[in-house]
């Protein structure tokens, strides 16, 4: 896409390298996926998020991918330095219009974290690194997220979660750990790690906006945020 430069190690220093990982496992139907993609695009262009991106002279590097099974991940946006509002608009449009690639595979959160770790290895030099995993289910394919912390170099990396709580799915997990607790105990880690909760895919854009603003360094009212165990709000 014209005017959008992919950045690498030689790019100017940035304050944050941010990886966004979107769940496209088989529990996410086409309508829900559209709400997720359009929700992320909407959140990126929300005034509060725009302001947060450009609140500092040091820019943010962004990469986005979709994930499902252990061998089923696909880049939606490789590393790009968000250094102008025009670049942010191009990225948002690309996310909204990129077609879904995988439909029928399970939920491999550990492998999504592995890909994220590899992406951070190719990111420009930044003051901090954050992985943001969105999902509507627990890991059911491949190694667990906690095993990824041992297998990949994620020391000092903040891993946040956007939990999509779908009411009709809750009955399927009756008697099992709830999704928010699962993410708190198994997915998030690192400095300042937190979870933002979306009450269904219709709520994804709101939750993503709040989470992005917080990740970019600003707190917002109206958030459904839970911190990792042992952290203070």
Language-model features: where?
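Von Willebrand factor
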Residues: 14-78, 82, 86-134, 161-171, ...
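Second-shell loop/turn segments in exported
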Residues: 21-31, 62, 78, 95-106, ...
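Extracytoplasmic/secreted envelope proteins and their assembly/folding machinery
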Residues: 33-37, 41, 45, 61, ...
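Surface-exposed patches in mature extracellular/periplasmic domains of secreted proteins
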Residues: 47-56, 106, 124-129, 220-224
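Exposed acidic/Ser/Thr-rich ligand/metal-binding surfaces
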Residues: 104-155, 233
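VWA/integrin I-like adhesion module and closely mimicked acidic/polar interface patches used
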Residues: 138-185
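C-terminal "exit" segments of structured domains
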Residues: 196-233
């Amino acid at each position: 896409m014209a005017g959008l430069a992919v950045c690498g190690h030689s790019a100017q220093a940035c304050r944050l390298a941010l990886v966004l990982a979107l769940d496209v496992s088989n529990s996410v139907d086409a309508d829900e996926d559209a709400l997720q993609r359009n929700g992320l695009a909407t959140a990126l262009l929300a005034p509060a998020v725009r302001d947060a991106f450009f609140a500092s002279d040091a820019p943010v590097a962004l990469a986005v991918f979709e994930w499902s099974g252990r061998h089923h991940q696909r880049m939606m946006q490789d590393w790009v330095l968000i250094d102008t509002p025009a670049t942010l608009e191009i990225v948002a449009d690309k996310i909204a219009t990129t077609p879904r690639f995988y439909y029928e595979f399970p939920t491999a959160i550990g492998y999504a974290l592995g890909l994220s770790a590899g992406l951070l290895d190719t990111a420009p030099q930044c003051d901090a690194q954050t992985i943001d995993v969105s999902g509507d289910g627990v890991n059911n394919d491949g190694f667990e997220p906690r095993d990824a912390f041992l297998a990949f170099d994620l020391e000092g990396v903040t891993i946040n979660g956007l939990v999509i709580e779908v009411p009709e799915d809750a009955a399927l997990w009756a008697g099992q750990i709830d999704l928010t607790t699962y993410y708190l105990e198994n997915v998030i880690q690192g400095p300042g790690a937190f979870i933002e909760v979306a009450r269904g895919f219709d709520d994804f854009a709101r939750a993503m906006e709040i989470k992005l603003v917080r990740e970019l360094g600003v707190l917002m009212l109206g958030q459904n945020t839970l911190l990792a165990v042992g952290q203070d709000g």
